[in-house]
């Protein structure tokens, strides 16, 4: 109680004020907050001595400001706000900044304008509401996770390597949340089960801002290998040429490689099964607009092509399987210019029919210098052949996206060990059928070899010695009997295989519970990394006119700026961020131009009225 009294005296509270019935029992923004009947909220309230309403944080019931206010005045001591959170009177600690020099990693604040335009904070507020009374509320937790991704702190455990006080100064807090706190916040969000809704809301925001760049959408699966002890469905990993326990995610990216949304496949379903639900979500995002979807050979299915066309989409994909090679004389040089770069291809353009002639498509085949032919199928008749080839080969940007997120953002990291029940009636390949089928294939191969040997003996038979077939059979009687035995074994194995179902419910194959990895927390962290990557991409686009090597070094430049130290200067209405110069003068000049563009956005720090003003010190 003595500590409480000291805190109250420091805040300037009086016994009269403490006796008022208007003491807030719930935050005004809480969805179920109500005033007692017959009582109107008072407009009077106490503000900490010297506290600036534009800086931060706590709002009483009668507060009229658009941002809550804090009872703390010292940015390094937020004990009053922590006390209010403990008493259940605070949903989220508002940012409170102090002037500081060379704050480590404060350059990450450059990302706030583009994070703000992504709508991530508004979407989170709409979908999740709040996390209840807390010092680290929804906004603070979400901002921490986003900045961690941009700092390349790939897991909550990585926070152990950084000073909470230093990270807190960037967040406008006395301390950043630590590992257990952040895990608990993620668990709270995952318990809501709304990651899919959150992802849809973010995708709607992205479409609203960049709809013109979404005429071509690239769909591809990404396999996350599982190394734990749970028995999970297997997926084929192309790099390993093996089927291993894993989880498959299907990402949809735009033509620049930036992600739009992600879906997790049930039991590692293939592209043919996953494309219909993916296109259903694309239709919900894009409306009736006709979109071209681009995917690899995993989605090759003429019947699926019909479904895609009936759903009002166009498509591009590689042709799978055998096809008639095209003679050299049918190939011609085609050129196209995209984003200022000229692309040249040797192409043959022709019409093909699938499904016994019912499906007519266009095939554009590329010929490489080594003679390899790559056929591309599409229904688009309006595009030049070179454009079709370029759009198809542009898939490499999505592959680079997977590689970049895996290395820089730990896309494949296991977020939690928890498992949830899976469908026990889900059908899987029957291992008994597979074992018999393997024996049958071996037996059939053995029979084929014996028959080939018998045929060779017949072909080389000397007629002078054995002029009749009867004589040949007698001479080859031992080989003939071996062939009959092998034939009978093949027939027996075929009967055994036909008596066994090819697929069975998964529950019949194991006595252990049928489970899968808990998807919610992983989906949520994927969305956070997706938004961080989008913000990084937006910054690269903004700096592109001012940096010649943006294609090769754009992301490296932005990453260096986000990781740099900065001076913080606070006024009544502004937070000035002055970055330290970068490694060279031309890189510093590029970031200076970026700062000028960001200043035009008039962005406010999330949760406060402070407008952000950026600058960078010139190289000495």
Predicted regions and their residues:
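Key DNA-contacting residues within the recognition helix of helix-turn-helix
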Residues: 2-5, 183
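Short, solvent-exposed alpha-helical "recognition" segments
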Residues: 5-19, 189-193
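Dynamic "connector" segments at or just before major functional cores
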Residues: 21-243, 248-268, 276-280, 284-285, ...
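An anionic, glycine-rich sequence signature occurring as long contiguous blocks
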Residues: 80-86, 306, 310-401, 406, ...
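Acidic, metal-coordinating catalytic cores used for nucleic-acid/nucleotide bond scission
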Residues: 293-303, 321-324
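C-terminal, active-site-flanking charged/polar segments
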Residues: 314, 332, 384, 392-428, ...
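Charged, amphipathic alpha-helical linkers/stalks
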Residues: 404-460
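Extended alpha-helical coiled-coil "stalk/arm" regions
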Residues: 450-497, 501-504
């Amino acid at each position: 109680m003595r500590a409480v009294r000291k805190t109250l005296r420091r805040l300037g509270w009086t016994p009269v004020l403490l006796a008022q019935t208007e003491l807030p029992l719930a935050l005004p923004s809480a969805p179920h907050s109500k005033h007692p009947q017959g009582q109107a909220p008072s407009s009077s309230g106490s503000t900490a001595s010297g506290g600036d309403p534009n800086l931060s944080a706590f709002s009483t019931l009668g507060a009229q400001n658009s941002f809550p206010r804090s009872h703390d005045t010292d940015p390094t001591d937020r004990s009053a706000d922590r006390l209010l959170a403990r008493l259940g009177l605070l949903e989220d600690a508002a940012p409170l900044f102090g002037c500081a020099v060379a704050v480590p990693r404060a350059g990450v604040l450059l990302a706030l304008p583009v994070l703000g335009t992504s709508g991530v904070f508004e979407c989170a507020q709409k979908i999740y509401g709040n996390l209840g009374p807390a010092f680290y509320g929804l906004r603070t937790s979400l901002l921490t996770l986003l900045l961690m991704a941009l700092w390349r702190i790939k897991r909550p455990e990585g926070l152990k390597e950084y000073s909470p006080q230093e990270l807190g100064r960037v967040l406008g807090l006395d301390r950043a949340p630590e590992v257990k706190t952040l895990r608990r916040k993620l668990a709270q969000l995952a318990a809501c089960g709304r990651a899919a809704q959150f992802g849809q809301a973010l995708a709607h925001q992205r479409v609203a801002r960049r709809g013109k760049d979404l005429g071509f959408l690239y769909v591809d699966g990404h396999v996350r290998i599982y190394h734990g002890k749970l028995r999970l469905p297997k997926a084929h990993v192309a790099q390993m040429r093996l089927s291993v326990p894993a989880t498959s995610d299907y990402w949809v990216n735009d033509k620049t490689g930036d992600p739009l949304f992600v879906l997790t496949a049930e039991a590692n379903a293939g592209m043919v099964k996953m494309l219909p639900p993916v296109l259903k979500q694309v239709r919900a995002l894009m409306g009736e607009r006709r979109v071209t979807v681009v995917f690899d050979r995993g989605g090759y299915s003429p019947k699926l092509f019909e479904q895609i066309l009936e759903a009002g989409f166009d498509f591009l994909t590689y042709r799978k399987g055998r096809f008639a090679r095209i003679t050299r004389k049918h190939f011609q040089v085609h050129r196209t210019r995209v984003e200022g770069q000229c692309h040249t291809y040797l192409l043959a353009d022709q019409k093909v029919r699938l499904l016994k002639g019912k499906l007519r498509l266009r095939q554009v085949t590329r010929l490489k210098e080594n003679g390899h032919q790559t056929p591309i199928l599409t229904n688009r008749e309006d595009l030049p052949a070179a454009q079709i080839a370029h759009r198809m080969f542009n898939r490499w940007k999505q592959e680079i996206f997977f590689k970049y997120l895996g290395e820089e953002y730990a896309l494949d990291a296991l977020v939690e060990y928890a498992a949830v029940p899976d469908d026990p009636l889900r059908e899987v390949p029957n291992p008994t059928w597979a074992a018999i089928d393997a024996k049958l294939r071996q037996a059939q191969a053995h029979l084929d070899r014996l028959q080939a040997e018998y045929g060779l003996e017949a072909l080389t038979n000397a007629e002078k010695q054995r002029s009749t077939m009867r004589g040949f059979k007698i001479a080859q009687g031992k080989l003939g009997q071996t062939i009959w035995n092998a034939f009978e074994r093949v027939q027996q194995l075929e009967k055994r295989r036909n008596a066994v179902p090819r697929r069975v419910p998964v529950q019949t194959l194991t006595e252990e519970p049928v489970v899968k990895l808990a998807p919610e927390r992983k989906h949520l962290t994927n969305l956070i990394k997706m938004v961080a990557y989008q913000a990084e991409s937006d910054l690269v686009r903004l700096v592109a006119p001012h940096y010649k090597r943006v294609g090769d070094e754009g992301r490296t430049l932005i990453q260096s700026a986000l990781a740099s130290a900065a001076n913080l200067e606070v006024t009544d209405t502004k937070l000035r961020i002055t970055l330290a110069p970068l490694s060279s003068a031309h890189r510093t000049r590029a970031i200076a131009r970026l700062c000028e563009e960001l200043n035009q956005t008039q962005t406010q720090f999330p949760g406060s009225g402070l407008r952000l003003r950026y600058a960078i010190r010139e190289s000495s």
